[in-house]
UniProtKB/Swiss-Prot annotation:
Protein species of origin: Rhodopseudomonas palustris (strain ATCC BAA-98 / CGA009)
Protein name: ATP phosphoribosyltransferase
Catalytic activity, as annotated: 1-(5-phospho-beta-D-ribosyl)-ATP + diphosphate = 5-phospho-alpha-D-ribose 1-diphosphate + ATP
Function: Catalyzes the condensation of ATP and 5-phosphoribose 1-diphosphate to form N'-(5'-phosphoribosyl)-ATP (PR-ATP). Has a crucial role in the pathway because the rate of histidine biosynthesis seems to be controlled primarily by regulation of HisG enzymatic activity.
Lineage: Bacteria, Pseudomonadati, Pseudomonadota, Alphaproteobacteria, Hyphomicrobiales
PANTHER family in alphabetical order: ATP PHOSPHORIBOSYLTRANSFERASE, ATP PHOSPHORIBOSYLTRANSFERASE ATP-PRTASE
Pathway info: Amino-acid biosynthesis; L-histidine biosynthesis; L-histidine from 5-phospho-alpha-D-ribose 1-diphosphate: step 1/9
Cofactor(s) recorded in Swiss-Prot or TrEMBL: Mg(2+)
Length: 325
């Protein structure tokens, strides 16, 4: 019996809920046969898949080790915790939740400090005046070092933070911070501001693949099936299905619809009876419906699409190109 294909997802909170909802929308239902407290799960219809419920940081670590094939975690954790991340893991696709920015934040009282160049000047002056480097509180040690090096800021030292990083300047354990934020409200409440060019990373939850995992033929086929579900759902979300039939429906009219409304005709041009099926961007639905009626259509129906399967699977092609041959 072949080893299971392991998919790691967050074990609690909003991230778990969003991850399970994402897979459910793609027709992949995650469940815990052992109950809510079980840390192992399954996907209906994919018997060789084992779902591992882990913390977001554990998911990144397991991806680096190759003990899971796919994992759902934030790009910030991937970039921070995995050395040479682009060679060891693949960010297959952003999942549309878990948005947050990793930022440099300084006290609002520093009215003359708005950019990283300003910060460079201030840190240099601070060291000359106080004979010590400015302290930066953060849990993003590697991201901070890399970003500060890009901006030639050298007169600082990192104070590792385990939590409540935004409070460090107020209690005197650091002069500034590098932390993650969604709205900036917590930073502002603690008297901090984000530098104009101080965004290290715009992060979101990603589906990530490990190059180090055991990519047997069975594992690759399982990955193809999972990614086929995800790609077909994503493709369906871009369009509504439009149907009509009228005598004046011809190839010239279809070409104009393509040009004006960005539609695609997945099953070719109109039939001999004038029957036509189009996939149309939602924002263009009314304009397309009006256009078709102006040219002779009595009825135009519009329906939501659940899935649109295509011969090509760009997500799996991306993965196949990344994995060892």
């Amino acid at each position: 019996m072949s080893a299971p294909f392991v998919l790691a997802v967050p074990s609690k909170g909003r991230l778990q809920e969003n991850a399970e909802a994402f897979f459910a929308r793609a027709g992949l239902t995650l469940s815990k046969p052992g109950g809510a407290r079980d840390y192992r799960g399954t996907i209906a219809g994919l018997d060789n898949v084992e779902v591992a419920y882990l913390s977001a940081s554990e998911i990144a670590a397991n991806l680096a080790r190759g003990s899971v094939h796919f994992g759902v975690t934030g790009e910030d954790l991937v970039r921070e915790s995995i050395t040479d991340a682009d060679k060891r893991v693949l960010l297959i696709d952003g999942l549309g939740f878990g948005y947050a920015n990793v930022v440099v934040a300084v006290p609002q009282a520093w009215i003359d400090v708005r950019t990283m160049a300003d910060l460079d000047d201030v840190t240099t002056g601070f060291r000359a005046q106080h004979n010590r480097r400015m302290r930066v509180a953060t849990k993003y040690i590697n991201l901070t070092r890399g970003f500060f090096a890009q901006h030639s800021v050298v007169d600082y030292r990192i104070v590792e933070s385990a939590g409540a990083t935004e409070g460090a300047p107020a209690v005197g354990t650091a002069e500034m911070i590098v932390d993650i934020t969604t709205t900036g409200a917590t930073l502002a409440a603690n008297g901090l501001k984000v530098l104009d060019d101080g965004v290290l990373l715009r992060s979101q939850a990603n589906l990530v693949a490990s190059r180090e995992a055991d990519w047997s033929d069975t594992a690759r086929e399982t990955a193809r099936v999972i990614l086929d579900h995800i790609a077909s759902r994503a493709r369906a979300g871009k369009y509504k299905e439009v149907r009509t039939r009228f005598k004046g429906c011809n190839d010239a009219l279809l070409a104009e619809a393509h040009s004006r409304f960005g539609v695609v005709s997945p099953f070719g041009g109109p039939t001999s009876s004038g029957m036509l099926t189009l996939h149309c961007p939602p924002a263009q639905i009314y304009a397309l419906g009006s256009f078709l009626r102006q040219h002779g259509a009595d009825t135009v129906s519009v329906a939501a699409l659940d899935y649109v399967f295509d011969k090509e699977n760009p997500l799996f092609s991306k993965l196949a190109a990344f994995l060892p041959q």
